[in-house]
Curated annotation (Swiss-Prot):
Keywords of the record: Cytoplasm, Exonuclease, Hydrolase, Nuclease
Pfam families per UniProt: Exonuc_VII_L (PF02601), tRNA_anti_2 (PF13742)
GO terms under biological process: DNA catabolic process
Keyword Nuclease attached: yes
Name the record gives this protein: Exodeoxyribonuclease 7 large subunit
Subunit and partners: Heterooligomer composed of large and small subunits.
Keyword DNA damage attributed: no
Reaction equations catalysed: Exonucleolytic cleavage in either 5'- to 3'- or 3'- to 5'-direction to yield nucleoside 5'-phosphates
Annotated EC: 3.1.11.6
Subcellular location: Cytoplasm
GO molecular function: exodeoxyribonuclease VII activity; nucleic acid binding
Length: 458
């Protein structure tokens, strides 16, 4: 018998595709450490090699657009750290990794730690812009946390002296390289916050390798910078060097010299600003005086224009103009009123009702005469019809019949007697005659026989 539900059947292509999707989606991007072997670079520029350790190996491919960023030439037997995506080459079913970046093993481990710490602190929000403190403008005192013998301190002091010689500088000397450097940098930041002598801090050093700059990728240093109440400007290495301290600091400067320029005012620029402000002030004063003079002249002219005699003369002239306008307006109004009166008189004469009244009265008299004639004719005809109707009614009236000797007898219930079967002995009858009524009682009822009809002759 067949099972109730058949199992899923994969083709080879579908199986390889499914495995590839599982590897790519479930594993994602990973870091792998191993030894290079079987390294080849065909004309396409891509790299193909095997990455192995003591017990296993895996095929690797690094395409040209990725390997051109590698700063060294991979060698057979070299230990490296790679960042790669796991996939499967479907036509052959070969499991392999696609390398995105490659570093020598020692430096690669540091880079891996760097990426892990960066992701951790970013997830905690230490890099968020909302926590960045604004720098003072201008700064009244600058604190410098760096090596007292390094080139970075020399560059910072040189720039500050050139730009703003009067700006106080407090140096918090500390080691910037080695195992003790992170702890010393943290203590220097905490000391600067405790003493609260300056309103901005420069934390940094000169350039170097990733190992040389590693103190500024230390988690303790990053958290000390984040916790500082005083704004911190990071100035580590060269412009291409980016450390964890740069992400946490309130502002990143590409070099120590650039940091000194950020926190200081340019004395020459300040002098130019003062001179420019002085020029603007002089121009503003000249403009103000010219404006006041022009305003005074306008007011003086207005006062002259508003002298009482001039005012009276203008009012007199205006009064005369108004009188002329009023006289002209009255004349025009009277003229228009007279013309309108003439037009109305003509219209009234044209619409005089007397002729129409006379014609209406004549028409009424004619209608009254015709109405009277019509009423007389109708009344005469009605009287004639009434007389004929009376004569006809008298001819068919029951009273006339009674007057000729006939009578009408009715039973007690008022029904007119037509047959003897309507009464019985003892009933009271009412007989109406021509000149009165006779009430009688029935003593006997006799029915007469109808005469037989004669038979027709054959």
């Amino acid at each position: 018998m067949l099972p109730s539900q058949s199992p899923a059947i994969f083709t080879v292509s579908r199986l390889n595709q499914t495995v590839r999707l599982l590897l790519e989606h479930e594993m994602g991007q990973v870091w792998i450490s191993g030894e290079i072997s079987n390294f080849t670079q065909p004309a396409s520029g891509h790299w193909y090699f095997t990455l192995k350790d003591d017990t296993a190996q895996v095929r690797c491919a690094m395409f040209r657009n990725s390997n051109r960023r590698v700063t060294f030439r991979p060698q057979h037997g070299q230990q490296v750290l790679v960042r790669a995506n796991i996939t499967l080459y479907e036509p052959r079913g070969d499991y392999q990794i696609i390398v995105e970046s490659m570093q020598p093993a020692g430096e690669g481990l540091l880079q891996q730690k760097y990426e892990q710490l960066k992701a951790k602190l970013q997830a905690e929000g230490l890099f968020d812009q909302q926590y960045k403190k604004p720098l003072p403008s201008p700064a009244h005192c600058v604190g410098v946390i760096t090596s007292k013998t390094g080139a970075a301190l020399h560059d910072i002091l040189h720039v500050l002296k050139r730009r703003d010689p009067s700006l106080p500088v407090i140096i918090y000397p500390t080691a910037v390289q080695g195992d003790d450097a992170p702890g010393q940098i943290v203590r220097a930041i905490e000391l600067a916050n405790q003493r609260n002598e300056c309103d901005v801090l420069i934390v940094g050093r000169g350039g170097g390798s990733l190992e040389d700059l590693w103190s500024f990728n230390d988690e303790r240093v990053a958290r000390a910078i984040f916790a500082s109440r005083i704004p911190v400007v990071s100035a580590v290495g060269h412009e291409t060097d980016v450390t964890i301290a740069d992400f946490v600091a309130d502002l990143r400067a590409p070099t120590p010299s650039a940091a000194a320029e950020v926190v200081s005012r340019n004395q020459q620029e300040l002098l130019r600003q003062v001179q420019s402000a002085q020029q603007r002030l002089e121009m503003a004063m000249d403009y103000y005086l010219a404006n006041r003079t022009r305003r005074f002249t306008q007011i003086h002219h207005r006062l002259q224009q508003q002298h009482p005699q001039l005012w009276l003369a203008r009012q007199q002239t205006m009064l005369e103009r108004l009188q002329k306008r009023m006289s002209f307006a009255l004349e025009n109004q009277l003229k228009r009123a007279g013309q309108q009166q003439q037009r109305l008189t003509q219209r009234l004469n044209q619409q005089n009702p007397q002729p129409r009244i006379h014609r209406a009265q004549t028409r009424i008299q004619q209608l009254e005469y015709r109405l009277a004639e019509t009423l007389r004719a109708q009344l005469s005809a009605t009287r004639e019809r009434f007389g004929n109707a009376v004569t006809h009614l008298e001819a068919v009236s029951p009273l006339s019949t009674l007057a000729r000797g006939y009578s009408v007898t009715s039973a007690a219930d008022g029904a007119v007697l037509k047959q003897v079967k309507q009464v019985k002995a003892g009933d009271t009858l009412t007989t109406r005659l021509g000149d009165g009524v006779v009430i009688s009682e029935v003593s006997a009822v006799t029915k007469t026989r109808k005469p037989r009809k004669k038979a027709a002759n054959p």
